[in-house]
């Protein structure tokens, strides 16, 4: 099953997440099909907190990709901001 989920990056105590489309059998930070955005929970000042390619997300969801709970909330937030 294909899922849209967060893949963790960044340094220790400084998380940065890529929002990726991946096969659910692959590791959290492992191989993915496509990167559709990022989420930076510790953004400061003028830094972007969330960037998401909503067209690609809609494409994957229409093709049967499932989203995790956190990614579903981020998609909702991105749509409200757009």
Swiss-Prot record:
* GO process annotations (BP): translation
Q: Which keywords describe this protein according to UniProt?
A: Ribonucleoprotein, Ribosomal protein
**Any one Gene Ontology molecular-function term assigned to this protein's record:** structural constituent of ribosome
Write one Pfam family the protein is assigned to: Ribosomal_S16
GO CC terms in record: cytoplasm; small ribosomal subunit
Record-linked Gene3D superfamilies: 3.30.1320.10
NCBIfam families the UniProt entry points to: S16
Concerning its family, UniProt says: Belongs to the bacterial ribosomal protein bS16 family.
PANTHER family per the record? 30S RIBOSOMAL PROTEIN S16, SMALL RIBOSOMAL SUBUNIT PROTEIN BS16M
Which protein, by its recorded name, is this?
Answer: Small ribosomal subunit protein bS16
UniProt organism field: Shewanella sp. (strain MR-4)
